[in-house]
Amino acid sequence: MEKQENVGHIVQIFGPVIDVQFPNEHMPAILSALEVKINDESIIFEVAQHLGEGIVRAIAMSMTYNLSKGLEVYDTGSQISVPVGKQVLSRMFNVLGQPIDGGKPLDSFIKNPIHAKAPTYLEQKATSEILVTGIKVIDLLIPFIKGGKIGLFGGAGVGKTVLVQELINNIASKHGGLSVFAGVGERSREGNDLYFEMKKAGVLDKTALVFGQMNEPPGARMRVALSALTMAEYFRDYENQDVLLFIDNIFRFTQAGSEVSTLLGRIPSTVGYQPTLSTEMGQLQERITSTIRGSITSVQAVYVPADDITDPAPATTFSHLDAKTVLDRGIAALGIYPAVDPLASSSRALEPNIVGKKHYLVAKKVVQILQRFKELQDIIAILGVDELSESDKQVVARARRIRNFLSQPFFVAQKFSGIQGQFIKIQDTVNNFDELLSGKYDNIPEEAFLYVGTIDQALEKAKKMGWSEKN
């Protein structure tokens, strides 16, 4: 006997949320996908609430311009599913897994639902292998763990997206594995730039891109990270791959959840965020993990509203991360990029039994000097450097050189800066900073350490500036 379609009718519309009347005995399950057909278009909704009397409330995954009350709504009987497997590589998708790159439609493919359970404790696997990024400040002070979760925190315009793109360039090209990029509520232009940069770098054939940009409704922005994660999970669990998952920007996931929560009639929690903030974040983050079959290493850009790191959105993300890289507007104002604040950043991998004793001691000494330099800032502002003790003068001079040497020219920014990008090996970074701490280069002008990769390049730059070893 042929299965009868479950059909309802729209009874109320408010923006991207609709109420649909179904027969009482055939209400669609929570998270089921609903479909509305208008002319040749199909709009997909996801069931969020059962209101009783056969009415369900659902969230749109695309624009709802042409909707009207009374339109028929079809229950698909399943969750939103996206294509997975080798066919998604080198392609660009929307939240529903539909290609948006103008390429040919996918041939036969497997589809997986975007909602899934996190791996159990028995399936998970702990690892302490360092992921080399080639970026000095990260490799030395905030080392990333393979299979870990990394957060890049910063306000507007401090360089989060550029840092994510540099990490994609450095890790994806050297790592050799597969990558999935989720563009969550960010600019369409950035997605376009990234697509062509990856194509140029030759890593597009190992990458899948999924976008729910800022012009799309909150339902799409809230679910696009799950669509990308579903693709990454398939590579981890069925292809036994080590996968890189880039999310830019995880704050927009929270922001979209807040918009939807208000439309669903929930009472807001702290600072206007949804009361389910911790639960939603946990459901996403707990799926991003390493298992006995493969690993997912996640790099997430996190916008910090009004530069307030204690805001509930970034604060909720903090608890899930292995490494926290904080970008600071004050450092960016000095013209030092990446504008990473070493004193606010941290990594659980910075332990002698993981990175080695020498690396650990050099990193701690660098942080100590920068901390002392920060403490002296008020005295310098009031009395000037001349009033400091000789030992403090030495700390200030050395800290300025260290601060400048933590800057680095990026490959993805060389068309703007005109400086060739640099990838620095961890051992070279540790040795260079060890020599800098020893006072060996105290006589080199501090400007020579800006935007160079190694000490040798700093010496070369100093000579071009008129410095000689006799000075």
Swiss-Prot record:
GO molecular function: ATP binding; ATP hydrolysis activity; proton-transporting ATP synthase activity, rotational mechanism
Assigned EC number: 7.1.2.2
SMART domains hit by this protein: AAA
Signal found in the keyword field: no
Record's subcellular location: Cell membrane
Root EC class: translocase
Swiss-Prot/TrEMBL catalytic activity: ATP + H2O + 4 H(+)(in) = ADP + phosphate + 5 H(+)(out)
CDD domains: ATP-synt_F1_beta_C, ATP-synt_F1_beta_N, F1-ATPase_beta_CD
Residues holding ATP: 154-161
Keywords on record: ATP synthesis, ATP-binding, Cell membrane, CF(1), Hydrogen ion transport, Ion transport, Membrane, Nucleotide-binding, Translocase, Transport
Protein topology in the membrane: Peripheral membrane protein
Top-level taxonomic group: Bacteria
Signal peptide interval: none
Subunit structure and binding partners: F-type ATPases have 2 components, CF(1) - the catalytic core - and CF(0) - the membrane proton channel. CF(1) has five subunits: alpha(3), beta(3), gamma(1), delta(1), epsilon(1). CF(0) has three main subunits: a(1), b(2) and c(9-12). The alpha and beta chains form an alternating ring which encloses part of the gamma chain. CF(1) is attached to CF(0) by a central stalk formed by the gamma and epsilon chains, while a peripheral stalk is formed by the delta and b chains.
Biological function: Produces ATP from ADP in the presence of a proton gradient across the membrane. The catalytic sites are hosted primarily by the beta subunits.
Name of the protein this chain belongs to: ATP synthase subunit beta
Source organism: Mesomycoplasma hyopneumoniae (strain 7448)
Gene: atpD
